[in-house]
Amino acid sequence: MIELEICVDSVESAVAAEQGGAQRVELCSALSEGGLTPSLGLIRAVRSRIGIGVYVMIRPRGGDFLYSQEEFSVMREDIAYAAKAGANGVVFGLLTAEGSVDVERTAELVEAARSASSMEVTFHRAIDMARDLESSLEDVVRTGAHRVLTSGGAQSASLGSARVRGLMQAAKGRIGVMVCGNVRPENVQQIAQATGAREFHASLRAPVPSPVIYRNPTLSLGEAGSDEYMRSVVLTQDVRNLRQAMDGILSYSSKSGD
């Protein structure tokens, strides 16, 4: 089966992902920061509303992926509470100052996830920020993680498709390779053909205006340039469109003899 994971930051978006045909969600907060650890309340609420897989982002702050000992301890605690809240998996990535995968500490967190409730682990796009993508894949394999999330080190999956294919060939079934980076209904079949991927990750966020009537024109509590009266959500139809395009991958492959 070709699997679809949708990145979400709310119960509303998680429900839309399931209704649209996704197999799992990556649950985060602060998607404007690239995704941070969600609250315990949000994890529990999402878990109670959907039946598909819930994979929780474990990232204590924005910025780089070099974490202090205090931050590492927080990540361990967050993995434990994600397990208690019913998560099926966790998502994280740790690098060294030199740009390599922090194998020792990543393996420790993988074991923590496995010990807590046999949760799966996705090593996220920290791998795309590493010094050497191919050797980093081998490092992640050594940690015991179940899959990596990658765009092939490029800004989009389309641009990084050649390297993604190389990673899939190098993985040799030892670890899953999930493709991300502007995956859309109009390009997913081409990405699948170019990479051989069978797992895809997408955000598909759409802007939705706030229903707030009164808006203080003299004060803004967000970052400069941000619109506090606009939020981004996942829409069921957008997920359904991507799922339908993905379902066409198998029929295309059978016709082409791939």
Regions found by a protein language model. Name each.
Residues M1-C7, V11, R47-S48, N216-L219, ...:
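N-terminal amphipathic alpha-helix/helix-capping segment at the start of soluble metabolic enzymes
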Residues G35-G62, V101-R125, S161-P185, A224-Y252:
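Alpha-helix-loop-beta-strand connector modules within alpha/beta enzyme cores
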Residues M178, A197-D238:
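Active-site pocket-lining/capping segments in soluble small-molecule metabolic enzymes
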Residues E12, L31-I52, E70-S73, L94-R114, ...:
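Active-site-adjacent beta->alpha loops and helix N-cap segments on the catalytic face
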Residues D9-A16, L66-D78, D128-T143, L167, ...:
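Catalytic cores of alpha/beta
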Residues M1-V25, A30-T37:
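N-terminal pre-domain/capping segments
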Residues Q19-V25, R49-G53, G86-G89, R114-S118, ...:
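Glycine-enriched alpha-helix->loop->beta-strand junction motifs that scaffold or abut catalytic
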Residues I2-V8, V25-L27, V54-I58, V90-F92, ...:
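Hydrophobic faces of well-ordered beta-strands that scaffold small-molecule active sites
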